[in-house]
């Protein structure tokens, strides 16, 4: 089958939104399909939004037997056999409209843009043969904002067999983009309240230097700089595998994330427990409190208690890690299941 994988991308910004497309491409090719990736650039600027939407609308993929669309606004592409694996809305116009992350005024002009966008999204989503999401969180948003029913289809990682458990040192690792909404600052602030010598390792690239600088200053001011390793870059896969093999646990504490996130899944493949928070969204679909990880209130004191608990009770941490790995099978997070559903 000839399959086109369609998505948008932010130039020079990597992340899970690229992985889901590129890893699916490899899985489809391994199953004997002919695959093309179709990317168009996306810039978060309201005045460019409709031009970007029109660019997708005029893409001609008639040569494909089927298209699978991921990141907005790729779902606007026309095709008689359009499948959508929806990973998030343009959130400032949806669930982040009333938050600090909107980034533009809630005036008449932007309300008009918001309403027109939602109308166009809903119409394009209705064109699909089938709509999947990457989480129940996103399915709930599709139902709430667009009146669209969708099936959660959890994205696996590539090369899951490379992740393994080797030991448990004194580090809690957080490997993801370093951005304010990922809340690495919450982890650094929490370390100040820890009573154990637990350490923190933050790995990932940032879109700018301001937030990274603020993390370093926070660590210095809190007197915990000697217990925070801050690696502002995309570490290699080999480094990631090593960090997860040896760490005490992983932490992933974003604000109302769309899905459980690859950091959660990679840690589980390494049989390590995951620390998250009650307002983190998608990770709560995977993490079960005190079963395969810990869920804390999003305050430094509460997160510190969880970090200390992971450190002081290594046997419980080991047991939760084993359960985290088993959770992957419980939720059918594997490429065979993904292909079966997308190609049905």
Task: Put a short name on every predicted segment.
Residues 19, 170, 179-193, 213:
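A conserved mid-protein helix/loop that constitutes part of the nucleotide-sugar donor-binding site
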Residues 102, 107-131, 139:
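Membrane-proximal helix-turn-helix segments that form the acceptor-binding/catalytic region
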Residues 212-234:
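Nucleotide-activated donor-binding/catalytic signature segment of Leloir-type glycosyltransferases, i.e.
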Residues 244-259:
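Acidic donor-binding loop of glycosyltransferase active sites
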Residues 269, 273-277:
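Short hydrophobic beta-strand element within catalytic cores of glycosyltransferases
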Residues 289-290, 294-300, 309-314:
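Conserved acidic donor-binding segment of nucleotide-sugar-dependent glycosyltransferases
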Residues 332-344:
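C-terminal alpha-helical cap of glycosyltransferases
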């Amino acid at each position: 089958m000839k399959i086109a994988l369609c998505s948008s991308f932010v130039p020079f910004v990597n992340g899970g939104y690229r992985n889901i497309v590129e890893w699916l491409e490899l899985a489809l090719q391994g199953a004997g399909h002919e695959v093309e990736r179709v990317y168009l650039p996306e810039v978060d600027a309201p005045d460019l939004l409709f031009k970007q939407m029109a660019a997708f609308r005029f893409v001609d993929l008639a040569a494909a037997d089927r298209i699978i669309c991921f990141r907005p606004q790729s779902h606007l592409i026309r095709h008689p056999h359009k499948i959508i694996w929806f990973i998030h809305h343009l959130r400032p116009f949806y669930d982040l409209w009333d938050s600090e992350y909107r980034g533009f005024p809630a005036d008449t002009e932007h309300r008009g843009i918001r309403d027109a966008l939602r109308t166009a999204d809903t119409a394009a989503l209705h064109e699909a043969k089938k709509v999947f999401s990457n989480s129940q969180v996103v399915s709930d948003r599709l139902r709430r904002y667009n009146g669209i029913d969708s099936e959660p289809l959890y994205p696996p990682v590539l090369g899951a067999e490379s992740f393994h458990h080797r030991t448990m040192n004194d580090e809690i690792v957080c490997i993801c983009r370093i951005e304010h909404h990922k809340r690495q600052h919450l982890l650094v602030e929490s370390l100040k309240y820890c009573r154990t010598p637990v350490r923190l390792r933050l790995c990932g690239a940032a879109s700018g230097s301001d937030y990274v600088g603020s993390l370093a200053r926070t660590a210095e001011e809190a007197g915990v700089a000697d217990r925070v390793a801050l690696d502002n870059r995309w570490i290699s896969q080999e480094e990631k595998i090593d960090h997860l093999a040896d760490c005490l646990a992983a932490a992933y504490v974003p604000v109302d994330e769309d899905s459980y996130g690859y950091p959660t899944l990679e840690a589980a493949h390494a049989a390590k427990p995951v620390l998250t928070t009650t307002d983190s969204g998608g990770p709560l679909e995977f993490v079960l409190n005190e079963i395969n990880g810990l869920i804390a209130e999003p305050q430094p004191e509460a997160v510190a208690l969880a970090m200390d608990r992971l450190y002081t009770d290594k046997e419980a941490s080991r047991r939760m890690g084993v359960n985290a790995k088993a959770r992957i099978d419980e939720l059918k997070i594997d490429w065979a299941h993904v292909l079966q559903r997308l190609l049905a």
